[in-house]
Amino acid sequence: MSLRDEILEQPEAARRQLGASLEALAAIADRLRSQPVESVVVAARGTSDHAAIYAQYLLGVRNGLVVGLATPSVVSLYGGDPKVERSLVIGISQSGASPDIVGVVEAAARQGAPTLAITNDPTSPLAAVSDFVIELDAGPERAVAATKTYTTSLLAIARLSLALDPDESAAAALAAMPDVLAESLATEPEVEAIARELAGAPGSFDRCVVVGRGYEYATAREWALKLKELGQVFADPYSAADFRHGPIALVQPDIPVLVIAPEGAAAAGQVELLHDLRERGVDAVVASDVAETRALGRWSIAIPTGVPEWLRPIVSIVPAQLFAMHVTRARGLDPDRPRYLSKVTRTL
């Protein structure tokens, strides 16, 4: 199965995920209601790290939880033992095999903290050391670059949020996500055309900046990673707020800026940034569900409309995945054979 096959499989993978691990989600919610936690700590690497960023925003905004990202090296390299007994500790890993992520969860379990694995392998070492397991049920992911395990990880986090604080309208929006993912896949022809125009000439599109904010900061990070690992593009991701604190000095006409700017709390700032980029003669690729915002870029990618902000990263990443794949092909590279990478990365 190719990378493109797995990108196209995401609506069906989402349907499977929405039906998976129902008992585990109920058990987690019961545990946290009977023994409330003060915070959440998430351990992850690579693409899963970007799912963790989504968890920071979603569980913070929707559930009122303080969410921090673990630094696995504190445990694995330095032998540290951060006090997390009053936290829910989550390990996110498609393979569940990275020793440093397993180590963080093991250390938390020794302190008596509730632990949760979000993984595509329910028999993995990560699952074995966790109190609860949400299986992604994405099916085998053969491509080196993670796609369907990323979107199903986001769905798993959204389902966790909903289990902790149920809401009928939110549940209905979540149930619609497979269909919205299918709608998002329909952007491929326009995305391919943009990728060919940007990256078709030898030596073109070897650098770019990717900017998102709020929930879409996770999308910016994941979009940039896909461009790096597949297309060998020096793609630098930023929060739009951080971008203005210095890195904006990097912008110049020959460095495209990819901006995720859908409707929502961060929209006004993204629109202001797009106006500033235009004044500086910088070409932008704008991904948005608002036509007026898309018109501010030289190129535009339509995101499905009507998706709640807290769920939108699940669909906004899909055209970004397609874009990275087509940029890779336009640069004469094979997206199914990324350089120096293997499917399972085990860091200590």
Q: For each of these PLM feature ranges, what is it?
A:
Residues 223, 270-274, 316, 339:
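Composition- and surface-driven signal marking solvent-exposed, interaction-prone regions
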Residues 307-348:
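Generic C-terminus detector
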Residues 3, 50-55, 220-222, 226-229, ...:
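Conserved phosphate/anionic-ligand binding catalytic regions in large, soluble enzymes, centered on
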Residues 1-38, 132-136, 140-256, 266, ...:
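Active-site phosphate/pyrophosphate-binding segments
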